[in-house]
């Protein structure tokens, strides 16, 4: 606040919201795991915010680093459909993972996506991975491929 007061022109007596926004950084770092959580919970707003953040930082978040995490999440979701008991503990024991992982990602994913949709999502992730490596895609940038994939997953 002291720095804002010092930077304030002599003719002004009040600090405005625009001056505060201009003097601080309003960006937030996101992780691939937050992105995975947003997709599993089908949180369209958060998934799109994170996707735009990744698109604006392609060197720090290349598509080839994002896709394996998303693939693993949806592959685990597909496997969970075959668990003999569809409870939190039943799925956790059957898959050999912690129950908090089931509670955080698997159960919301099972509520939001059918088994057929998950198979289609896995296919779309594999297709996006191939396209990011130049197969059937000579020039589409990674950010555009990610946008297409996220739209397919969420809609």
Name each region found by the language model.
Residues 1-15:
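Short, charge-rich, low-complexity alpha-helical interaction segments
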Residues 69, 120, 124-127, 149-152:
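Charged, amphipathic alpha-helical oligomerization/scaffolding segments
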Residues 85-90, 137-144:
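Long amphipathic alpha-helical segments
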Residues 3, 53, 124-127:
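Residues within well-ordered alpha-helical secondary structure of globular protein domains
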Residues 12-120:
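Small-residue-rich helix-loop
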Residues 139-155:
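Acidic, carboxylate-rich catalytic segments that either coordinate divalent cations
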Residues 5, 32, 74-81, 129-133, ...:
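A structural signal for well-ordered alpha-helices, especially hydrophobic packing surfaces
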Residues 107-139:
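C-terminal capping/gating helix-and-loop segments adjacent to ligand/active sites or protein-protein/ligand interfaces
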């Amino acid at each position: 606040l002291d720095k804002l007061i010092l930077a304030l022109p002599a003719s002004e007596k009040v600090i405005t919201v625009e001056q505060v926004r201009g003097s601080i950084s309003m960006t937030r770092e996101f992780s691939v795991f937050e992105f995975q959580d947003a997709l599993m919970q089908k949180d369209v707003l958060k998934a799109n915010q994170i996707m735009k953040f990744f698109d604006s930082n392609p060197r720090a978040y290349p598509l080839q680093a994002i896709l394996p995490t998303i693939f693993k999440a949806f592959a685990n979701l597909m496997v969970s459909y075959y668990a003999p008991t569809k409870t939190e503990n039943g799925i956790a024991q059957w898959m050999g993972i912690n129950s908090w992982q089931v509670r955080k990602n698997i159960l919301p994913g099972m509520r939001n996506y059918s088994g057929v949709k998950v198979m289609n999502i896995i296919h779309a992730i594999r297709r996006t991975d191939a396209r990011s490596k130049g197969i059937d895609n000579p020039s589409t940038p990674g950010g555009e491929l990610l946008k297409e994939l996220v739209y397919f997953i969420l809609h």
